[in-house]
Amino acid sequence: MVLPILYSFRRCPYAMRARMSIVRSGFQVEHREVLLRDRPTHMMKISPKGTVPVLLLPDGTVIEESLEIMEHVLSWDLTENEREWVRRNDVEFKFHLDRYKYPNRYDDIDELEQRAAACKFIESLEGEIPDGNLSDAIFPFIRQFANHNREWFDGQNWPNVHQWLAANLESEEFSECMIKYKQWVPNY
């Protein structure tokens, strides 16, 4: 039996999102761990944009977006509310997260202003903690934000977010999702 192939990078929150859905659904894949500075030729051939995750199905279908991978493996039909949460996470929050975490990559960026802007999304999560598939779509990004300055993050008055994030990070599914794989190297 030919398995679908998942190209992934362990620390990428988009790839985590896809892997969480794969773990939760029991969807079987051949996992190919890549380094983004050394992308495999096969991955670049099927997905020239060069980002992860990429799921190659046995019929040749290529799924290049993490949310689409979630939808495929979970047969998940997002509600309008779920789509809006994901949009806010992927567009608004991620914009500020990148500038907070990597201010040297951007011109005229104030790291603390970017953190404050990102906090608006987290404050909205505090009042409406996601669950199920939506939780898996969002928490990898909150994890990345929290890990940039864990002491500061833990000191914020977000008890619901802290509890939600801790529960996700302590789950068996997340541990399975974060198994360390050696870099995949083609054997030809």
Outline where the language-model segments fall:
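Short, hydrophobic secondary-structure boundary micro-motifs
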Residues: 97, 154, 175-179
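Extended, well-ordered alpha-helical scaffold segments
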Residues: 113-121, 156-170
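GST-like domain detector, emphasizing the conserved glutathione-binding G-site
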Residues: 1-128
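Long hydrophobic alpha-helical segments typical of transmembrane helices together
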Residues: 160-188
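Residues at alpha-helix termini
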Residues: 25, 46, 132, 148-149, ...
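GST superfamily/GST-like fold recognition
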Residues: 133-151, 157, 168
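Surface-exposed helix-capping loop/turn segments at secondary-structure junctions
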Residues: 127-134, 172-178
